[in-house]
């Protein structure tokens, strides 16, 4: 249960979070990180250090061991698609067909229908163990983790668009864009992405992750970084 901090999170904007212990991660064991994304994250670490925080190159070791998590996530994703279609069918009052949803959704559900109870139980066990292992890093005294939001700069138009031949094309290509964020979809921890850099005129995000119930730190530190970077004043070379 998230703790009651006594006032709305919005009122944490502009407050002093105190000196925080922050870990910095600029690499991924699953994919190469674009130099613009890594450099922006490193520069953010320098900014945070300049604001008085204690910043170190360290991160949860759980993030180095996420191959099993990818398998478990896909199992959960497929079964979740089946449940979603069953819920939709209840609302429609009839069975859902492939004509009712996007081909990618239908394909995910088809995969989900083939998941055994043993595999589903195994996936839940893997995700549960991952959550517990991840939590120990924060329990060891760290307040925030700083990573790139994505391992690559923003994708070009249609780069992640599904095709008739491959309805899951976008999902397959999205891994570099989700490698830093998806672990925290699994743990349920609060995180924030801030546009703290740019690549070819497009924003590059940096992710800050807090422990359970510590959205207040994200609000306070996010405001500190906004005051330093002033991203609202930045414009791409071509903009409307």
PLM region spans:
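Short, well-ordered beta-strand elements
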Residues: 194, 202-211, 218-219
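Structural detector of well-ordered beta-strand residues that form the stable sheet scaffold
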Residues: 145-147, 192, 209
């Amino acid at each position: 249960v998230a703790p009651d901090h006594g006032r709305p999170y919005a009122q944490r904007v502009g407050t002093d979070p105190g000196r925080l212990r922050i870990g910095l991660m600029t690499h991924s064991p699953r994919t190469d990180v674009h130099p613009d994304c890594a450099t922006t994250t490193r520069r953010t670490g320098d900014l945070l250090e300049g604001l008085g925080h204690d910043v170190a190159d360290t991160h949860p070791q759980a993030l180095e061991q996420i191959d099993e998590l990818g398998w478990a996530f896909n199992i959960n994703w497929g079964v979740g698609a089946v449940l979603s279609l069953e819920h939709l069918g209840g609302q429609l009052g009839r069975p859902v067909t492939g004509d009712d949803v996007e081909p990618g959704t239908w394909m995910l559900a088809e995969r989900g229908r083939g998941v055994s109870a043993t595999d589903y139980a195994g996936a839940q066990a893997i995700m549960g163990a991952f959550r517990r292992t991840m939590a120990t890093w924060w329990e060891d005294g760290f307040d925030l983790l700083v990573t790139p939001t994505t391992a690559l700069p923003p994708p070009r138009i249609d780069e992640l668009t599904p095709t008739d031949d491959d309805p899951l094309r976008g999902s397959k290509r999205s891994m570099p864009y989700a490698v830093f964020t998806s672990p925290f979809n699994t743990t349920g921890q609060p995180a924030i992405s801030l546009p703290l850099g740019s690549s070819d005129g497009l924003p590059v995000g940096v992710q800050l992750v807090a422990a359970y119930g510590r959205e207040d730190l994200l609000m306070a530190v996010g405001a500190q970084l906004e005051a330093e970077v002033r991203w609202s004043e930045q414009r791409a070379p071509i903009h409307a």
